[in-house]
């Protein structure tokens, strides 16, 4: 399981992470992982900006851009954000825990 990215900028603590809702917001903007590598000028800033949405949804874009400019180890950071994003899709296939009312399904045919 990937861990959220945390940092402090100008004495404010930030947490970058994704859940399925914020991943959907990112996808609705046309995001795909492949584009991070083929069209980085568009999609690297996009994934960085939307990583704020889970915990800091009202942050201004110009502040996010300022933070990104000063952020060290950008390649490692973007890889961590891609991993967090991909993990949200994996949760779609998690098996339920506990007794879910004995829900079962079958394919007829």
Model-based region annotation:
Residues 43-54, 79-86:
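Short, hydrophobic/amphipathic alpha-helical patches that form generic packing surfaces
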Residues 19:
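Residue-level signal for threonine
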